[in-house]
Amino acid sequence: MSETILMTEGLSKRFGSRWAVKDLNLDVRAGEIFGFLGPNGAGKSTTIRMILTLLLPTSGNVKIFGKEVRGHRVEILSRVCGIVEKPDFYLFLSAHKNLELLGSLSRKVTRDEIYEALEIVGLKARAGDKVKTFSHGMKQRLGIAQAILTRPDLVILDEPTSGLDPQGMKEVRELVLKLSREHGATIFLSSHLLTEVEAVAQRMAVLNHGELIAQGAVSELLSDGSSYFTISATPMDKALAILRRVSWVEVVAEGNGIDVRIDSRRAAELNRLLVTSGIDISAFAAKRTLEDYFLKITEGASEV
């Protein structure tokens, strides 16, 4: 098992009578992309602010690189960079000057380091342009350049694709993968965009109403419980009629194929049932997604 880079132990934050985060235990390992998922208002940004010591917890501890942040703040945070919510810049200054000023808050950064960070995020050609001329997506990428400027061992990104169009989201996703694969950074990625996390993260935690409701490998969490399958069958109308009569099958959509929700352990049984009923099956494919899993467990948690 890889070394634990970031750990929270019973981390909690209360505002008045409301618990924004309650008894949170996270385990982020070296070199991985860790997805931190939850709907808006789940407590993700509050958690990140506590990790970065921007907000004092009501109770609990944060350990980074094996040490409690409270007693080693300067030492630890010199190896960490986080962008909370949207990055802010001096709009009337150039991208280069912004990174020079913001980087100097940690240490003096060189011209080469600034250009290298801008090159990684695809903004080297715009280094001299004022940030006020940048699109939202370019500002998000500049924020990531700021995060990696001092070569941190841990990068914390809070909703980095927020407000981006599909192309911008794709660029940020590819950038996150590049930081992990080519630069060896451990990345803590907060998002409510579940398909984005599914595409890049090895492990994840799911937060709902301030409480941890799941944590583990994405592949393992996705394989648990009911799944969605798309069935291509002939004759389609007869197959649909059979499926609607089976009590443990939920037909959720029909079109070129039939989308059903079943217990994944009964997929082979359903396939046999259709074949023995005279249905020609040309495709029976799983459609399980992280969103299905997320909706399932958050619905379950809200019913408790």
Regions found by a protein language model. Give the residues of each.
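Alpha-helix N-cap/helix-start and coil->helix boundary motif
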Residues: 12, 96, 120, 194, ...
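Residues that scaffold the ATP/ADP-binding catalytic core of kinase and kinase-like folds
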Residues: 72, 221, 293, 297
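Short, charged/small-residue-rich alpha-helical element at the C-terminal edge
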Residues: 227-300, 304
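Alpha-helix boundary recognition
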Residues: 65, 78, 198, 222-223, ...
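Short, Lys/Arg-enriched, disordered terminal segments
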Residues: 1-3, 303-304
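ABC transporter nucleotide-binding domain
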Residues: 173-261
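ABC transporter nucleotide-binding domains
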Residues: 3-8, 13-189, 194-208, 212-214
